[in-house]
């Protein structure tokens, strides 16, 4: 195994430590699992051409206009969008269908909106 050094924000480290205490694993094991998950997901996304899925977005009210505008720019892949207010934040579930590259591009643009805390893509293959 190789050894690496990692710098993360204090808040994120606190959250990681809470999880590893509950899971009873080391920081190294936690990071190893997270990296493996990310690599597998990236590999899977790169192999499938056409997809159907859902993007979960968590944000505050400042992002509403930007998200609605972005959805209209990607209306070729956005099927429907559902917005749920929850504990001072907004959870939006966006059903999507289309080409992998277009879906990934849309998801990345959602992540780039400053008031978006999370944009998580979940997909299945149409093959």
Curated annotation (Swiss-Prot):
Presence of the UniProt keyword Membrane in the record: no
Presence of the UniProt keyword Cytoplasm in the record: no
Natural source organism: Methanocaldococcus jannaschii (strain ATCC 43067 / DSM 2661 / JAL-1 / JCM 10045 / NBRC 100440) (Methanococcus jannaschii)
SUPFAM superfamilies from the UniProt entry: ACT-like, Ribbon-helix-helix
Entry's family note: Belongs to the transcriptional regulatory CopG/NikR family.
The protein, known as: Uncharacterized transcriptional regulator MJ0080
Origin superkingdom: Archaea
Keywords tagged on the record: DNA-binding, Transcription, Transcription regulation
Pfam families: NikR_C (PF08753), RHH_1 (PF01402)
GO molecular function, one term: DNA binding
A GO BP entry: regulation of DNA-templated transcription
